[in-house]
Amino acid sequence: MVGRRGWQTGLVTSLNEPSPDAAHTSDAAHTPDAVASGTASSGTDTPDGAPSLSALAAARIAVEALLDGGVQHVVVSPGSRSAPMAYALAEASAQGRVELLVRIDERSAGFTALGLALSTGSPAAVLTTSGTAVGNLMPAVMEANHAAVPLIVLSADRPDELRGTGANQTTVQPDLFGEQVRFAVDIPAGSNPERAVQTGLSAATGAFADLAPGPVQLNLAFRDPLVPEASDQLPVPAERQRYRIGTEPLIMNLPPASTDLVERRTVVLAGHDAGPVAEAFARAHSLPLLAEPSSNARFGPNAVGPYRLLLEHFGSGAAQPIERVVLFGRPTLSRPVAALLARADVPSALYQPVPVAWYEPGRRTELPLESLADLADFAGRGPSDWLDTWLLAGSAAQHALDLVLAQNAPATGPSVGSLVWKHSRGQLLLGSSNGIRDVDLAGLPAPEPAATVYANRGLAGIDGTISTATGIALGGRQETTVLLGDVTFLHDAGGLLIGPGEEQPQLRIVVLNDSGGAIFDLLEHGAVREAGTYGDAVERLFATPHSVDIAALAAAYGVGHSAVSTTAALAEALALPVEGRSIVEVRTDRRSLRQLHARIKEAVAAAVGGVLAR
């Protein structure tokens, strides 16, 4: 039986409901048909009477299957029960067949693997020992689930005879991640893991119909001995293969819209992970493009900058109201966009050529369309003055916003977002909370994309941002910048820990340090704080102020550090090439942030109102 979220987890729910005649096998049971019917279970250690494999022999088979299935990177956290996999991976690494990264903290390891999968487009694996080590992967697995990222969890476990006995570091690991994974299998000690690994990789990469890519758990039980035999040794080292060189951001072209299409005042919304097809569609149909930064569509002649401040000027009572909405990707950043999509009088359609992991069918109001031809019929083509009106309003809004920001020599969140966007190149990761929203507000769309943009918008948590950025930088093999707030930075400070023998990424970490969480001041909590009715509760419970010396923290981890407080100094720092790891700390004051946003909104409203009244 598949629960309400079966569209997302597909092979998981039934996997852990074995039929009476499943025979607790772990070989033939791992075919897609067997998994779907609920017969992939485990129990005895020698399924079908097959000879029991040694721990290292089984691990070598698992590694071969992983590499054959496209895994190029494995992040390893140390542990004894996972030793057979670690030794087998070391052998493959010595042959130049896989890249290994070592991280002490499993939570950081999970997000590093997530970043590797994001930047390479290939499944990336993370290996842990048994016990709490596996549980530390839950945040990365949850993000990978909702963001459709092929993350392979390799969790080592005790053999069946030690489970439930109080054996050290032993808990119930099979299906630990529940509905967060596309596939979970418990592979008994001594059994051949090949087909289970193959099925897991198929599920992770979206090979099964109606199942989006996403994380899987391969729970591998090992029995002593866990180390190689005395006669074993590493292969002769071969030249290490580098699997990826960062590519330039993409630009697509579509044929111009047919003149037979109906003219409609349609807008194109490009949410997270929309891709360049959104820009191409807007351009081909002469429609305004309202693109979030992580859409990788925020460029081109149709892109409108501070669009979220313009939507109220094109509402139902406006001279030129929005008639339809075409959505690419997932919108996550602003309430005005959510309000537009919720309007019953404005039909909307979602371009969805493949299964996605961020919503359940029937739970959203947009009409899902699989083909661009159907989308074109829905959207129509823009009237002659529709795009021009939006571009004029957008230009006026951008100018007004820039004037307000120019009045403040000290750096502010929006001015930092504007500068980071302007100077971005290579790869850019935008942290959750205010950072990505500052870029969305103030980042000027460019004629062509300058960087490939990433963000953890699956669940939009602040977890693991530094580690994700490290994985992105190492996977893409080009300079990478990450913009994040101080709370997000401190939440993953352990992600700065990279051993002396490990490869160092080209990573610039821009930290907007306003000594706490500023986003709550821009929400309703800011009004509560201003009213003073709850004393210092808002500051203490939501802003969570701190006095961390980021320079000292950087020095402790061996990471370069510089501090700036003005927009001019930040622009100079961002113009420098990225060499190794460095932190640019931007020291700001959040006490007047709510007032700054009010001034921006007022200035933009006046400027746009003047343009539209002509």
Name every feature range the model reports, one short phrase each:
Residues 143, 154, 161-174, 438-614:
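Thiamine diphosphate
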Residues 59-63, 80-86, 389-477:
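Active-site diphosphate/adenylate-binding microenvironment
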Residues 114, 118, 129-130, 136, ...:
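Glycine-rich, anion-gripping cofactor-binding loops and their flanking helix/strand elements
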Residues 52-127, 132-142, 442:
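N-terminal cofactor/phosphate-binding cores enriched in small/glycine residues
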Residues 77-79, 189, 219-222, 269-274, ...:
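Structural motif
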Residues 70-73, 118-128, 134-136, 143-149, ...:
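Structural signature of the thiamine diphosphate
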Residues 15-16, 45-53, 329, 338-436, ...:
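Phosphate/pyrophosphate-binding active-site segments
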Residues 144, 155-200, 291-398, 499, ...:
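Glycine-rich, acidic loop regions that bind phosphate or pyrophosphate groups
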